[in-house]
Each structure stands twice: as structure tokens, then as C-alpha cells.
Amino acid sequence: MSAASTTVIVGAGFGGIAAARTLRALLPAPHRILVVDWRPEVSLGAGHTWVLTGRKRPEQVSQRLSTITRHGLEFRCAEVVGVDPERMVLEVAGDKVKADALVLSPGARLTMEPLPGAAGVAHQFYDLDAALRLGNALDEFKGGRVLMAVIAPPYKCPAAPHEAALLIHERLSRKPGPERFSLSFVTPEPQPMPVAGATVGAAVRELYEQRGITARFGGKPVRVHSPSSTPAGSPPSRAVAGELELGDGTREPFDLLIVIPAHTAPAFLRESGLLSGNGWVSVSRDTLATSFEGVWAIGDVTHIPLAGGGMLPKAGVFARAAGEGVAHGVAARILGAPPAGSTPARFDGKGGCYLETGKGEAAYVEGDFFAESAPSVILHAPARTALQGKEKFAKEWARWY
């Protein structure tokens, strides 16, 4: 390949920034690394529960992407509107950008559309601004029934909804008002964190039972009924009452509704030929290569099947490891051979995440998700050391930028 190549990385989240920083260390300066993201800044998803509980401010869990240029990277804040993976050409805000290697790490887009009536009523915390609005709504909450609901899997970080439920329960329990509240959780899934197995699911159920949180598994939300529903979709700034209709026709009343939005692949991929029938990009499990030469995909936009019928969780820890591995594959393509002195990294499906449980503690969930018969996953009992581990994880994330 030419002495001056261009690698384009779409998305600067966990996977994209890990790929960019690792690749920069593997390639000499004449080789360009261009990172494209429609956002001027990114936030740490694991920190959103800190924002909604008032523990941290939004600026403490976010990073401006313009700073990545100090690491020898180029950055363009623009929307990708199309991609031709066969020619490795991106359409970026009206421009055509040709790449010698292309890494797709655009993340997933969030939507309330599969749940009619949710607009203007349902809060969420997967967006940083939404997490802040939810925190304000919790501050002003006067009591009643809090209902959390998963619209549909898959979604980012399988532990996040359960962490949020536990921390919201703790926050409301400590608040001078409301005088009385209850918290319920509804999901179409058969148990908490299904990919982690029955033992982990039972442990999370026990955490709920200890706090009096009621959970309904196998219940699919189909419609929100509330006078405050708005077709335009203006996000709520306060608690709004109504009822959540489920697939079996029953209704769950609420005074504050919090949902986990549905996740979809970005629109620019729909006509690319990259999406499989399940709506995500299929990749080689260990190399993250797509079916197109010189094109890789990592993170939330991918679908990686597991033994037992599940899929690899959409989680930052996996995206980061995948990004590091992909960087070695890109470098080998650009240089014609693996970089001298480097050890090629292959994605092994091992990793873990933190599940804050309140009282200054967190549980740590870790596993080998590529185990032959089924993922092998363990949930360690809540401890203060695990929460310290999450805080360290957040600091390490910030250093990537």
C-alpha cells in the first residue's frame, strides 16, 4: 500500500477511540487516521446513573472529541449519510471520503417509536441530557408509582436497567419526600440479563426482592396511555402519570415512567448491504471483519452470535477490546504485514461490567462469552471495592481522549 494511507473510523465511542489510539501507535505518521462522529462530545454510559442520582454533573462524565487531535488523529464532526463498503467510500455531509481501511463503530441509535404514546411521557437515561432531566424529575417527584420498562432487547449494557432501578430506589428511599412510593420493573426478557445465565439472573432478582422492587418478566410493552402523550416527541421534564399497556392486554399504572429505549443501527447503514436480517452488522467473531475486504465493524452496531442462541452484549468493555484487536488487523493491511514488535490482538469475548447496588457498593459481573456450550458468567457479591473499580474504569476511559 502507498506510503500515505487513510484509515477512516466512524464513531468515537469506546470501540472507535480504542481503535484510533491503538492504530496511531502502530502506524508511522504519514498514515492518516480520520475519526468521524456526528457528536461534538461523548459521554460515559456507565456514568449516566451517577448523573440521574445527582452524584456527578454531566461535564464530569463527558469528553469533547476535538481533543483527540492531540494524539495525532484527525477529527471531523459531521453526519455520515451513506457508505459504499465495496469501494470503501463514505458520504459525509455531502462530501465523498475514500478510505484505504474502514472501521465502523457508529454505535446504536435510540428510539421510542416502537412504543406508541411514549413521547412526552416516558423518561430515559441512555442519553446524557435525558439522564439529567430524569434526575430533576426525581428531585421533584411527590410520590406514587415509579415504573421502569424495557421496550425491546437488545440494548446497551444489560446491567444498566437493573443498576438504575436499584439506585433510583435508594435515592427515593433517602429523600425527605415522597412520603410513599413503589418501584416496578417490566421487561419482555425472561429474566434479568438473560445472556448471563440463570444463576446471575436469580442473584439480580434477589437484589430486587430485598428492596421490595416488583419485577415482571416476559411482559412486552405495546402502548403508553396518558393525556400528556405528544406526537412531536418533546421529552418530559417532570413526572407524568398514565398507564403502560402490555402485550397480554393488562395495564400497569404509573406516576413516573422510565423506559429503556429500543436500539437500532444508524440510518446510513440501511442501504449499505452490511446489515443482516436481524438489523445489525454481522462480523467474524475473532477479527471483527465484515464480509467486505478492508471493512471492520465493532461495538453496539454488530451482532455476534453466542453458543446457546444469545448474542454478545452491547457493552463498552467489549467494544474497547474489539477496537484494540481491529487496530492490529488494519495495521497489517496498511503495512502489508503485522507491525514489527507488536503482538496481534484477537478478540476473545472475555470481559465484565459493574452493577451498582447502592450503599456505596457494586457487584462485578464477568465472564467468558465465547465459552463452547454457553457463556460462563459470574456475579460477584456487592462490595465497596467493586465501586472503586468502576470509578477507576471511568478515569481510564477519560484518558483515551
What are these regions (language model features)?
Residues 155-172, 312-322, 352-363:
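Short, electropositive alpha-helical surface patch
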Residues 2-8, 73-176, 258:
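FAD-binding core/adjacent interface of flavoenzyme oxidoreductases
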Residues 170, 317-347:
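Internal hydrophobic alpha-helix adjacent to the cofactor/substrate pocket in enzyme cavities
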Residues 361-401:
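C-terminal auxiliary extensions adjacent to catalytic cores
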Residues 118-142, 235, 251-321, 332:
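FAD-site-proximal beta/loop scaffold in flavoenzymes
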Residues 32-34, 71-83, 97, 169-282, ...:
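A Rossmann-like FAD-binding core segment of flavoenzymes
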Residues 2-73, 152-198:
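Beta1-alpha1 glycine-rich phosphate/pyrophosphate-binding loop at the start
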